């Protein structure tokens, strides 16, 4: 487990990878803050909200932020809107000492990486399976 703040950024079904990380960490408690951001197109896609909210209610160091990218699809949605990676970054003034896991499509993962690195996170601070199976083309 990381020894600093952990930021988990999931797009759509990428939540399943983050769920696995959380379930691995939970038995020992969250020694450092864990922030889970889950981005979906519309609020009805938030199929694990109850589980995420239960983690938040059990652990003071766990924070859950659902984000809807297309609020027009969810007229009753009163939560956060926008791109999940941007919303995650906006919550932190200093990202120089965080660990970030990102799960989503290549475009989303690389745009999140670029934004966090631009704000001071070392590139090695971010992890995603995308880096292995869809590496960024060399320029």
Regions found by a protein language model. Name each.
Residues 11-12:
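Polyanionic, low-complexity intrinsically disordered segments
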Residues 5-6, 124:
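The start of beta-strands in P-loop NTPase/AAA+ ATPase cores
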Residues 1-5, 73:
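Hydrophobic alpha-helical context, especially transmembrane and signal-peptide helices
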Residues 33-139:
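Reductase modules of NAD(P)H-dependent flavoproteins
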Residues 6-7, 101:
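Conserved beta-strand elements of the Class I
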Residues 3-4, 24-34:
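Conserved S-adenosyl-L-methionine
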Residues 15-27:
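Histidine-anchored nucleotide/phosphate-binding helix
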